[in-house]
């Protein structure tokens, strides 16, 4: 994308201005079919399937590169272990032991049966301040379609508008509407111990 190419150009210029060879300080995360895959402009290339979006692909090579560089490969390995545990939970046929399925069913009910057009995700931790944006990308990009997987138009709402902020930020802004406004907005409170 233009944004990625602009960022790459900025970093290459900064490295060059510092007297460094960019090809010895930059890596590429791309698909194996990309021209970048065989480029000598990078120290190494890590591959991901071309159908995986990069912005929040935390378990792909995109997330692996960032998390490993920032926190070490051991932390990324632990992250993948946690994701694998969640994958195992999502295969449970008992909806009450499958949090992902339960959340999905509640979301479909709220949007398609009750007709609520939005959902607020309210994490009560500043460390999770970008979590609503993560869910926006996962849910709204995937469900933001007017056709099904066969290209046929659909005649039902495909998903809610997801928004949110940490509780302490939202308390003095949109919480007013949530508490005293005329619309019903489903809320998802996120906490941790």
Please report, for each region that a protein language model flagged, where it lies by residue.
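Glycine/threonine-rich flexible loop motifs
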Residues: 2-6
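Active-site phosphate/pyrophosphate-binding segments
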Residues: 7-193
